[in-house]
Structure formats: C-alpha cells, structure tokens
Amino acid sequence: MSETKIKIKDLATELNIAPKEVLAAAKKLDIPAKNATSTLTTEEARKVRGQVQEASGDARRKDGASDVIIRRRRKGSGAKPAAREEAAPAETEAQASPAQPEAKAAAPAAEAEEAPAAKPAPAKARKAEARTEAPRARIIRPATPQAEEKAEPAPETAAPAQPAPEAQSAAPEKVEAHDAGAPVQQAETTESAPAEPAAEKAPAEKRRYEVSMEPEKDSVQADTEADGDADGGRKKKKKKKREETAGPQVRVISRPDPAAVQAQAAAAAQAREERAERPDRGPRPAGARPAGPRPGGPRQGDSRPGDGRPAPRSGAPRPGGARPAAGFGQPAQAENSSPFADGQSKKKRQKGRRTVEFGDKGAGGKKMREDVGGNWNRGKKGKRKPETKPVSTQPQRAAKRKIKVDEAIRVSDFAHQMGVKAPEIIKILMSLGIMATINQSLDIDTATVVAAEFGYEVEKVGFSEDEFLLPKEVDADELLLPRPPVVTIMGHVDHGKTSLLDAIRKSSVTTGEAGGITQHIGAYHVSTKRGDIVFLDTPGHEAFTAMRARGAQVTDLVILVVAADDGVMEQTREAISHAKAAGVPIVVAVNKIDKEGANRDRVMRELAEQDLVPEEWGGDTIFSYVSAKTREGLDDLLEMLALQAEVLELKANPDKPARGRIVEAKLDKGRGAVGTVLIQEGTLKHGDAFVCGVFSGRVRAMFNDQGKKAKQAGPSIPVEVQGFEGVPVAGEEFICVKDEKVARRIAEQRAIKQRERDLARESKVTLETFLARRKTDAETQTLNLVLKADVQGSVGAITDALRKMQTEKVKVDIIHSGAGAITESDILLASASDAIIIGFNVRPTAKVKDVAEQEKVEIRFYDIIYKLSEEIKSAMAGLLAPVVREQYLGQAEVRETFSVPKVGTVAGCHVADGKIIRNTKVRLLRDGVVIYTGRINSLKRFKDDVKEVAKGFECGMGLENYNDIKIGDIIEAFEEVEEAATLD
C-alpha cells in the first residue's frame, strides 16, 4: 500500500470484509471504483472506512443476546511470559468491562470461584473438551477501530488496560465461560494495533473457525444452562435440548498443541515484524504467540458487561511457540491449527458437541461476522452443509456452448448434440432456403449458421491423420544416400518409346503389346555401365493424358522421344506441357534416324518453337540422336542421362518408413488388388502396414519389374505390392504407418469424409433445374455402359475418352467401372439399367457368359483403345434418329386442265426440268406459293400409264385428293431420303 493511494482489495483486507462490500460502500459515497484492483485516495479511503463502520455497527445491534459458553481445559502455567507482555497492552486496551481493572489482584480467587462453576458442564461439552485439550477457545473480534465501531456503539469503545505481569501470574483455568449476551464487550477483547500482526500469522486458523456459529446458538445456550446447574459432575454425560435463540455471531478459536508448533516460531516472528507497521486488519486468530504463553489471571472484574459471566477469566497461560504461518493464499486448515491436531478422532468430535471448521472465505482468507452462520446442519450431528462461495464483484460472462463438427454432420446428429429437436433445425434450414431432411448432411458453413441461431458455436474438429502419419521433416545430410534417377519416356504414339526402352533393357516388351502400342504405364529398373536407372514407360495415345501427367509428377528426368520422320506431333506438345508443369528437365531423343526421310533439322526447328532450343543453337536442351532398331546412339543417351542425374544430386534417406506413389493399380484374379508403387523415400519391407487413399493394407508380397519376389525396396525402386484392401487410384500417395490398426483407422476416416463431401456437394433441386432437366432428358439419348478393364489406369483413360465423345444429343453414362474381370453382378447391373458391358483386356468366365445370355446383355471386348472409341462412337450415333433429307426430282408446268368423270381434274403438263416419277411427292406452286403438298395419283403419256416422264415431254397428271388445278401452276416433284445421323 502506497502513502497516498490504497487498493480496494487492500482496504477490504484491512477492514476484514470482502472487496464487494468495500465497492458497495464506495458506490454509496459516489466514489468511482470498478473492481478490487481500483485505487482510492487517502481521503476516499477514510470516507469508505466510516461508511463500513456505520454499516457494521447497525448489523451488530441487530444481533441477539444469548449466553455463549466456551470451555477450556486447565493447562500448566509453564509457558513463557514474553508473548503476553508484548500483546497484553494491545489486548487489554479495548477491554470493555468497567469492572475489569478491579479484577487485577483477584486472579487466584476468581479462578477458584470459576472452576467449581465450570465443572457441572454437560456430557457432550466435556467430550468436546477432551478432544480439544490443547486448543483453548477465545472469542475475539476485529482489532481495527472500524471493526470496533461495527461491533458496538461508540460510547463503549474505551476500557481500562490490563497489565501484562498480573495476567502472567494468574493460575491456569479449567473452563472459561463467555457471556454471549455481551457482544459489544466481546468484540473489544483483542482490539489493538499490536495484535494485528498476530491476526495475519494464522489466517488459516481463523478461516477455519470463522465458518458458521449462528446455527449453534441453541447448543451454546444449552451449555450455559448446564454450567449453572451442575457443581461437580465433570465426568457426567448429559444431553440438553437445543433451543433456537438469537445469539451473537462469534468466532471460537482453539489453540494447537504448543509442542507441535515450535518449528514455525521463527518464520512467524519474522512475518509479524514485517507486517507490524501495517494498519490493523481485524482480530487475532487463536494460536500460540511466537514468544511464549499469554499471561493468565482473572479479568478485571468478575464478569463482562452484559448478562453476567459465570466466572472471571482464568489465569492459564497460553502455550508458547509460533503461530501457524498461513498467508492469504494458503490452505485453510494447517497441520497444527486443526481441532483434531491433538489426536482426537472425528467420530468423537461429532457426538453432540459444537464443532468449528475453518472456512476459506473473504478476501485474504478473512470472513466477515455478518456472513458467519447458516452452514451448519442441526438435524444430524457432525454434518455440515456445503459452504456457499462468495459471489464475484464482476458478472461472469456466459461460456460459449460449442458443437464439434467434422467435415459435415447429419441433421439428426446435429440436433442431438445441441439438445434440440430435428424439426426445429429443419425449420431454420427452410428459412435459409435449404430443403433438408433429417438424414441429410450439412457442411460446416451451413452448420455454423444454424448453430448460431441456437446460441452455439461450431468448432471444426475431427480425426487428424497428421499425428499418425510420419512427419515429413527434412533429413540430415549424413542420412541421405545417392539414389537412382527416375526417367520417364514420353512422346507421340508410334514414335518408338517402348522400342527404345527395349533396346536399352535388351528385352522385347513391344512383342507382347496389343496393336504394337503401349496402353499401360510400366516401371523398369535397368542396370547400365553408368549406374542404375529407373524408367517409366508411358502411353502415347491421346486417351492416356492422365497417365503421362502421373509419370511426369514422380520423375526426375523426361526423355522426349520424337521420330525423325514425323517431327513434333500433338501428344509431343502435350508431353512437353506435362514436363514443364512438373518442373522436370527434358532430354530430347530423336529416334528413327536410320529411316529414309529422317530430317533432324526439322525436328530441331519444331522443338525450338516449343522453347526447347538445342545446345547446338545456343540453348540448354540436350539432344541425342538414336535408333532403337540399330541401337545407334544409345550409349550417348545413357551418358547424357548419367550426367544430368549427377547434376541433380539425387539423394534419399533409406532408413525410414517408406513413402511413394501408385504408378498403376489393377485387380488380379488370383492375387486380389495389386498396385505398382514407386518408392520415393525410405525402404518398403515385407509386412509393413500402409495407407493409400481410402484403402489400407499390409505388404503381403512384393515383385520387381521382372516378376521376381523382393523382400524390400529402397528409394527410386518400382515394385508391385500385393495386399491392398481395394484397388487404389493411380497417382495416390503410398505411406507406411506403424501398424495396421492405425492404417485402417486413417483409411476409414478418409472414406467417411469423402462420402460426407459427396453428399453435401449434391446440388439442390429447384423448379427451374427440374424442368430444364426434363426437357433435356426428353431430347437427349443416353448410352449406359458398364466398364471393366485390367488396370485402374486404363479405366480412367477410357472413362475420360468416352466423356469427351458425348454430345448434347447423346450422353454416355458409365454406371459402373472398375479394374478386374467381368462378374455376375456386373451382368445383373447391366440388365437392370439397359447397359452394354465393355471389357478392356478382360474376358468373362463361361458361367458369366451364360448369365449374360439369359439376361440378354451385350458384352463387347476390346484390347486396343482406339477401336473401343470408334465402336462406342458408332453406337452413340446409332441411338440417334435417322436424318430425313429431301431430294429434288423435277418440275412440270400445267398447260391445260381436263375434267374426267369419276376421276377428277387432270392436268396436262410439260416437263420443264428433271423428271416426274409416279407415286412421288409433289408440291403445287401458284405464283411461287405452295398451295398443295401430296402425291401423284396417276401419270399417263397419251393413254398409257408410265412410271416416269423425262424432261421435254408432255404428260397427264392427276393429284391425290386435289382438283383445284389451274393453268400456269407449277408441279414440283421430290422424294425423302433417310440418312444415318452423326454426332457432329
């Protein structure tokens, strides 16, 4: 506390009240104070003290006046007198009894009179005395002047002092009876400044005994009556009926055993010296003084002012030793300040005797007298009601209620978490324009808006797979070892990519390929004189764009194969774009230089237009001229690859769990789901658990590019892994985890999130979109397909190719697609949806064929993708209605008309152009306007029926059901021809 200002909480501690009461007093005085840390000036503090004293005085005058008797056992007087000499002036200064000065010399006689009066105490009182033999109870009141004014009227604040030496020479007392009807004088017994440091040394003791005395006033009264009735039966047990009387609010303080608190004397004395200069803060809690016992002796006078005291104060000295050192923030019950410190059991303590508990109340561990009471249960012995905590001066802000939501949440689950009914949430969604059902999923944005309507806050949580997946920290340089480069061969179809790889590997891959073209992405590990190289062979067909993109993503180098006789083609440009997008250096291999018509300069010029300038022309692109057929230039190409790989300094850490990419995946009939994995870092071993996309698994077996079993695979090594739970998507990341349980959990969470995203992403149907869809469906034909291929990459390539072919007139709907053989379920699905089954490099079993015949399902088989594309295109065109085209035949001019009975009007015509054919369609034109469209009923030349009449001849012509023919009309003959519709 500074010289000029004092904080609210410090002032509350000084006045032994809660900060909220100081704030209330300041508010009455119009003193601005917001919280307990606000400061007051000296003048403001003085006003607040006066206000608090006035309020506490009013409260004291309302207290009852029943007698309260607290007994203490007689103790030896061997305690030290130093403490009493120190505290006696302060304690006796506030003694309120006018008869106390006369009692100085009468201590022995007073004690002799008091002891017999105390003997006939009730049995329950004596049992409690036995339990609390060491502590002696005293009723003390706050020592500050403010507390004094609060406790009693002003005229009674002064009392003669009691000398310390006489009090020290008094004999120990057996029982001390306090007058409960004199609360004013009781509050003054320890009212002095020197007593204030002692009050701070045992706040824990004080807090415990401050709890609630008021509900026990009846027991106190009963004890008083028992003392007056009995003379000598101290061992006699007697239970008195409890009566509810209005007694004063008192605090009973028992002292601990002096032998148990000697160790705390030094610390307590030092603390008392430090706080000696601070203002008074209230009464001194009980406990041994640091320097010795209190002096005994009778009080000045035989009783306190009030209803009468049974006996004068006994002269038993307080035991010496330090007070229990308890600060403002220490626990309420110290080891030696407890009523049970003398070894008395809790069971005995509960038998009908009033017991006192410490309570942690008020600021700094202090409790106001107005708050004492109300926490004791008089119905059952030894049981106490839970104490109420002080209310904070500041209103507590309501905690935000939170709902934990993953990627999406169903309406029913959302309602359950918020504790509301689902229709209420649906009503809110309808007001937001969302027609939702109870099982519909809501994304996190919609859920946030809805939760705000109910006062909730949405917290995005969920399963975090990052903590399970291995961290991608940067490996130390000493752990990195050189790895083989991954080289992807790209280029246009039929430019010799696979043939070049065969020449390098000295194998014959092309001989086993359908149509001589590559339709799968292949990974090959090749050992050369310059070191190991891993080649990825990608398809060049336009349908395999995704495969080429995957190859460029996982590679270190790209060999762009360009035929010397063809030059740069469409897929060549696409491959260049993929390589540039992946940031991969390109090495150009000009193939077929042995063929006639090879033009190297043309290739260089066309590549320069694509920003691939050769080194010969001042660029930085490496060109190599090779012939896969004659093996010319292969050594130079490998030399260039080794040089480029050395520049890149390719390294990886093999001593860690493996990570890689799925290059290709398929469903093998005997082995299940199999994926070709290119390891990028770490080492993949047999038995490792892994997760890949929404699938998990364990490595059951590994095969290298030559089909041989492998036990492990290091960085840049391609292996075929067996053990997937499902066919993974090509291009997915392959990650090893610590065990299969973690892998399965990650895969399940990914699958759940994927499904929730798909459900939440579904577009809502409006009237406009519904009508537009119906109109489109009526005009559009749909070709339903069930697609099965040998590998997952082919499925993706065919799907992309078919979707590119669909037009506004014909849509392609791939109902189901997958890698693996055609099964019975595929047949049944196609039958139910009127679909055609497309098999790419797969064949059905005999049983499946029989099912297809029974269900009348058509199955088409292909092994070359461009043949598949052509036939699907023809099938799509076949769904369209044929196009009807009108073909002009000729014209005839009407020169004369004849009326023939039973026939009608016959026109005599001259064929001016073309020819007129019988039974063809005609138009009758009059002044250029079409008057009639119909057919020729009869055609004659003279009297003979003819099939046709050529140009320049005359004929007679009758029209079907039309007779209004006039001279000068023009008859135009035409026919309708049906043509097959096209998708263009």
Curated annotation (Swiss-Prot):
Annotated spans, G5: 627-629
Domain tr-type G: 482-651
SUPFAM superfamilies the record matches: Initiation factor IF2/eIF5b, domain 3 (SSF52156), P-loop containing nucleoside triphosphate hydrolases (SSF52540), Translation proteins (SSF50447)
Subcellular localization, as worded in the UniProt entry: Cytoplasm
Low complexity bias locations: 89-123, 154-172, 187-197, 255-270, 308-334
Stretches for region Disordered: 32-402
Region (G3), start-end ranges: 537-540
Cellular component, GO annotation: cytosol
Residues annotated for GTP binding in this entry: 491-498, 537-541, 591-594
Basic and acidic residues bias (residue ranges): 126-136, 198-220, 271-283
Keywords assigned: Cytoplasm, GTP-binding, Initiation factor, Nucleotide-binding, Protein biosynthesis
GO molecular function terms noted in the UniProt entry: GTP binding; GTPase activity; translation initiation factor activity
Residue segments, region G4: 591-594
Annotated region described as G1, given as residue ranges: 491-498
Family matches, as InterPro entries: EF-G-like_DII, EFTu-like_2, IF2_II, IF2_N, P-loop_NTPase, Small_GTP-bd, T_Tr_GTP-bd_dom, TF_IF2_bacterial-like
Role description: One of the essential components for the initiation of protein synthesis. Protects formylmethionyl-tRNA from spontaneous hydrolysis and promotes its binding to the 30S ribosomal subunits. Also involved in the hydrolysis of GTP during the formation of the 70S ribosomal complex.
Similarity comment text for this entry: Belongs to the TRAFAC class translation factor GTPase superfamily. Classic translation factor GTPase family. IF-2 subfamily.
Full protein name: Translation initiation factor IF-2
Organism whose genome encodes this protein: Oleidesulfovibrio alaskensis (strain ATCC BAA-1058 / DSM 17464 / G20)
